[in-house]
């Protein structure tokens, strides 16, 4: 059985219909733009959709430029829901694991890899990386 994972830098769902979510989405967009402008930071994640065979390892890539972050975080976002924190890795750590998840952080390559081993259809979601 094959399924897909999405990896995006920023994902908004304006059709949710709740005023509070629209308001918060606008505030988050403004804050994100301010942080991006101040740090002149560019984050790139690999392909928008990734098709994975069940049981195989899924690997998502997050590349960044211009500065060295103190840490990098990965989040999972299911449709119609907010992002959920998964893992945080610090600049002095090369690798971090949690159950079937593994994150590597290479400050020389300015890259983080996010691996999901023994992939399952329930892993289908949007995955996001964030720097600080």
From Swiss-Prot:
<dbReference type="InterPro" id="IPR051006">
    <property type="entry name" value="TCR_variable_domain"/>
</dbReference>
<dbReference type="GO" id="GO:0009617">
    <property type="term" value="P:response to bacterium"/>
</dbReference>
<comment type="subunit">
    <text>Alpha-beta TR is a heterodimer composed of an alpha and beta chain; disulfide-linked. The alpha-beta TR is associated with the transmembrane signaling CD3 coreceptor proteins to form the TR-CD3 (TcR or TCR). The assembly of alpha-beta TR heterodimers with CD3 occurs in the endoplasmic reticulum where a single alpha-beta TR heterodimer associates with one CD3D-CD3E heterodimer, one CD3G-CD3E heterodimer and one CD247 homodimer forming a stable octameric structure. CD3D-CD3E and CD3G-CD3E heterodimers preferentially associate with TR alpha and TR beta chains, respectively.</text>
</comment>
<dbReference type="GO" id="GO:0042101">
    <property type="term" value="C:T cell receptor complex"/>
</dbReference>
<keyword id="KW-0675">Receptor</keyword>
<protein>
    <recommendedName>
        <fullName>T cell receptor alpha variable 6</fullName>
    </recommendedName>
</protein>
<feature type="signal peptide">
    <location>
        <begin position="1"/>
        <end position="40"/>
    </location>
</feature>
<dbReference type="InterPro" id="IPR007110">
    <property type="entry name" value="Ig-like_dom"/>
</dbReference>
<keyword id="KW-0391">Immunity</keyword>
<feature type="glycosylation site" description="N-linked (GlcNAc...) asparagine">
    <location>
        <position position="63"/>
    </location>
</feature>
<dbReference type="Pfam" id="PF07686">
    <property type="entry name" value="V-set"/>
</dbReference>
<dbReference type="InterPro" id="IPR013106">
    <property type="entry name" value="Ig_V-set"/>
</dbReference>
<keyword id="KW-0393">Immunoglobulin domain</keyword>
<keyword id="KW-0472">Membrane</keyword>
<feature type="disulfide bond">
    <location>
        <begin position="62"/>
        <end position="129"/>
    </location>
</feature>
<comment type="function">
    <text>V region of the variable domain of T cell receptor (TR) alpha chain that participates in the antigen recognition. Alpha-beta T cell receptors are antigen specific receptors which are essential to the immune response and are present on the cell surface of T lymphocytes. Recognize peptide-major histocompatibility (MH) (pMH) complexes that are displayed by antigen presenting cells (APC), a prerequisite for efficient T cell adaptive immunity against pathogens.</text>
</comment>
<keyword id="KW-1279">T cell receptor</keyword>
<dbReference type="InterPro" id="IPR036179">
    <property type="entry name" value="Ig-like_dom_sf"/>
</dbReference>
<dbReference type="GO" id="GO:0002250">
    <property type="term" value="P:adaptive immune response"/>
</dbReference>
<keyword id="KW-1003">Cell membrane</keyword>
<feature type="domain" description="Ig-like">
    <location>
        <begin position="41"/>
        <end position="132"/>
    </location>
</feature>
<keyword id="KW-1064">Adaptive immunity</keyword>
<dbReference type="InterPro" id="IPR013783">
    <property type="entry name" value="Ig-like_fold"/>
</dbReference>
<keyword id="KW-0732">Signal</keyword>
<keyword id="KW-1015">Disulfide bond</keyword>
<keyword id="KW-0325">Glycoprotein</keyword>
């Amino acid at each position: 059985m094959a399924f897909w994972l999405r990896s995006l830098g920023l994902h908004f769902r304006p059709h949710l219909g709740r005023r509070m979510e629209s308001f918060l989405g606008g505030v988050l967009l403004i804050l994100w733009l301010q942080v991006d402008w101040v740090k002149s930071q560019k984050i790139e994640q690999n392909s928008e959709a990734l098709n994975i065979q069940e049981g195989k390892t899924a690997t998502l890539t997050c590349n960044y430029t211009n500065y060295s972050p103190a840490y990098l975080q990965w989040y999972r976002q299911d449709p119609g829901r907010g992002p959920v924190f998964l893992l945080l890795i610090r600049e002095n750590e090369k690798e971090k694991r949690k159950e079937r998840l593994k994150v590597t952080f290479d400050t020389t390559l300015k890259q983080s890899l996010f691996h999901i081993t023994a992939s399952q259809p329930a892993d289908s979601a949007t995955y996001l990386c964030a720097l600080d």
